[in-house]
Amino acid sequence: MNNILVINGPNLNLLGKREPDIYGNITLENINQKIKLHFKNEDLKIDFFQSNEEGKIIDKIIESEKKYNAIVINPAAYSHYSIAILDAMRSINIPVVEVHLSNIYKREEYRKKSVTAEASLGVISGFGYYGYIMAIEFILNNLVRENNIVVH
């Protein structure tokens, strides 16, 4: 069985209430349910983790290498400045795909740069919750099923 960890960063626990004009009315719990439902027929275990604390996210990334085949991460605001999360992502030997619900390139200038993207295989931005599904599909189709070796 393949194991994938989905990490969500700060304020994503406020989805459904926070800036619905940008993020819609969907909650993080709804997103997690949609992801699980989409992959219910796969030989796949998906765990979800959310924290507003940078250190907890870093710890989870570092611990993940022992338990997971890959990570899907939405670092949220940390993506724009957290060298510590970037370093944690670089320190592990499993693939990471970065996801953003909104199109960060259509947002404020300071949101257009993702430092954490440097340690990601790729970034999916602007497709709402479906970005998580796209990331997991990529992982399953290109990394797990074909046994491709991924080098950061």
From Swiss-Prot:
Q: Which HAMAP family match?
A: AroQ (MF_00169)
Claim: Lyase is one of the keywords in the record: yes
Quaternary structure and interacting proteins, as annotated: Homododecamer.
Q: What is this protein called?
A: 3-dehydroquinate dehydratase
Q: Which family does it belong to?
A: Belongs to the type-II 3-dehydroquinase family.
Q: Where is this site: Transition state stabilizer?
A: R18
InterPro entries membership: DHquinase_II, DHquinase_II_CS, DHquinase_II_sf
Q: Biological process (GO) annotations?
A: amino acid biosynthetic process; aromatic amino acid family biosynthetic process; chorismate biosynthetic process; quinate catabolic process
PANTHER family found in the cross-reference section: CATABOLIC 3-DEHYDROQUINASE
Q: Which organism is it from?
A: Clostridium botulinum (strain Langeland / NCTC 10281 / Type F)
